[in-house]
Amino acid sequence: MLKKSIGIFYRCFYLNNKCDYYLIFLAPFSLFTQIFMVITALISVANSGQMSLIWFTNFDTFTYQSNSLAIFLVWYYFLNHKSRWFENSSLVLSVTGYLVFTVIFFNFYALSRFTGIVNIEPDVQGWFSTITTQLPYSFNGSFINDWNAFSELLLHVIHPLFYFIYVGLLFKTYKFIKPPRNLQSFLLKAGIYPSIYAFYLQTIPFLNVWDNGENSYSVYGFFTQTKYNSYVWIWSIPIFASMFLILWMLFVINNHYYGKKHHK
């Protein structure tokens, strides 16, 4: 019985190399991040009295979903590294692309706020959106403000950075993980989730969620308000296309790196 228990423990932790040792740190930290997101959503509910805010403004954001996918991937690999999903790098590249997109666009938004290029007025903030007048990453001593600031830092800098280190170690350590060979097939499969999410962004303002006749719920306020803002399509299409550009770049980098490793 003892030998069997030790065997199960060993299969779960596979302490064979740097990547496996790093997972001993990353797996619990990722779990902490997921719990932190749940607590943040519950705080939103407590402050507003709106139970629906567990989903709206929290788990319906690309930030929460891309981080959650990365957390799921880490734990799935941690517990089942021999799964057929890891026979090639398609899944890892896809999730990495989603998180890269999150990091780039939120930090671009943060930079635009700090430089004054974007100023958040009530009409930009929207109605129950994730856009607030609070500057990103700004701590001021208020519990709610500081909690939100740390949440932004955790989900847009700290956790993504630790995840990217894991991906780097994974590809450096396990040379047998083959890259996807067909770009069109890879983009088609990897693009399913962001396409569904984009459809959600475009349709939620029309579903009469907190609709007062002049504004309605939009995940990112003015920037995704398709019902009351006719200009939203100007930036929506290129932003959506940039997701596929990121996935294409990861595909090219991965194939080039894999080729170099196997022709030494």
Curated annotation (Swiss-Prot):
Keywords tagged on the record: Cell membrane, Membrane, Transmembrane, Transmembrane helix
TM annotation in the entry: 23-43, 59-79, 91-111, 150-170, 190-210, 233-253
InterPro entries in the cross-refs: DUF1600
Pfam families referenced in this protein's UniProt entry, alphabetically: DUF1600
GO cellular component: plasma membrane
Main location: membrane
Disrupted gene: phenotype observed: Probably essential, it was not disrupted in a global transposon mutagenesis study.
Subcellular location per the Swiss-Prot or TrEMBL entry: Cell membrane
Membrane-topology descriptor: Multi-pass membrane protein
Protein name per Swiss-Prot or TrEMBL: Uncharacterized protein MG133
